[in-house]
């Protein structure tokens, strides 16, 4: 097993309020795998919500967290695709633009901080796949799923823009699918796998948001899967809460529950469903335990 795996945790602002089970299941899974998360109390929001209102504030928010992680000599781990994409993009801009770096560092210096571009930003899936490795995860698996079919949904910000995030091939990614199949489940191909879940439109045009979600869910159902599986809090909220919304509003019975990847992997690692918060999902996903060997 890989030793001394410590990362600074960039929390998602959404999860403590709307998706606490993602935090608790991630903590349980990483503890089981020997990965240590360090809470840097001074961390702020990644700045994603500010991108289109105040670009400099957006840059400063991410740069501050990057500088704080640098001070601790820790790479940043996040399980939020929006945090991941934002921090990766800002890290890229700050490394490339000397004048921007100088301007932001002048502000950071008021707190005794400095950005030097020395640390990396990593998604939870990236750490599991690249840093820990499939073989090391398999050693910890104690139960596997039988005949369970899963539709993986990567989410937009983890894959694009490719030249900045450098996570996987954005047109034909495999990392998430390989991680899912460690559990014994089968990752089933489906045509709309890489399309947006509809989350960015929620609150702007709810009907369009629900249309995008419903189209994806109907396509996934046609592939014969039992569950969706995601690793982004906003995508999970869309497939869980918003799916419930359109099932009610549109009088539909064609539901497809969604699981967080940490819930799926956690069950294979022998963690109980209560700790993983499966009962906290809006749509009932507790039946997944019936597929465990």
Language model feature labels by segment:
Residues 1-293:
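Iron-sulfur cluster-binding electron-transfer modules in prokaryotic oxidoreductases
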């Amino acid at each position: 097993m890989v030793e001394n795996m410590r990362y600074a945790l960039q929390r998602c602002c959404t999860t403590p309020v709307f998706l606490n089970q993602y935090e608790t299941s991630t903590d349980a899974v990483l503890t089981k795998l020997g990965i240590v998360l360090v809470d840097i109390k001074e961390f702020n929001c990644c700045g994603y919500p500010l991108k289109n209102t105040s670009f400099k504030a957006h840059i400063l928010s991410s740069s501050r967290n990057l500088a704080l992680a640098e001070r601790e000599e820790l790479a940043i781990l996040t399980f939020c695709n929006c945090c991941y994409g934002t921090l990766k993009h800002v890290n890229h801009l700050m490394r490339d633009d000397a004048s921007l770096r100088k301007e932001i560092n002048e502000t950071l210096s008021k707190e005794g901080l400095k950005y030097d571009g020395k640390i990396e930003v990593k998604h939870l899936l990236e750490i599991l796949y690249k840093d820990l490795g499939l073989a090391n995860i398999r050693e910890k698996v104690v139960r596997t799923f039988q005949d369970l079919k899963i539709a993986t949904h990567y989410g937009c910000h983890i894959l694009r823009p490719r030249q900045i995030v450098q996570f996987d091939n954005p047109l034909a990614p495999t990392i998430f699918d390989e991680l899912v199949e460690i559990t014994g489940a089968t990752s089933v191909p489906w045509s709309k796998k890489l399309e947006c879940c509809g989350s960015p439109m929620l609150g702007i045009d709810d009907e369009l948001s629900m249309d995008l979600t419903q189209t994806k869910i109907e396509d996934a159902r046609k592939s014969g899967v039992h569950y969706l599986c995601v690793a982004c809090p906003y995508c999970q909220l869309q497939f869980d809460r918003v799916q419930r919304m359109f099932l009610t509003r549109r009088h539909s019975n064609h539901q497809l529950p969604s699981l967080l990847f940490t819930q799926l992997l956690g069950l294979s690692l022998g963690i109980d469903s209560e700790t993983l918060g499966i009962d906290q999902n809006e749509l009932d996903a507790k039946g997944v335990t019936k597929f465990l060997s």
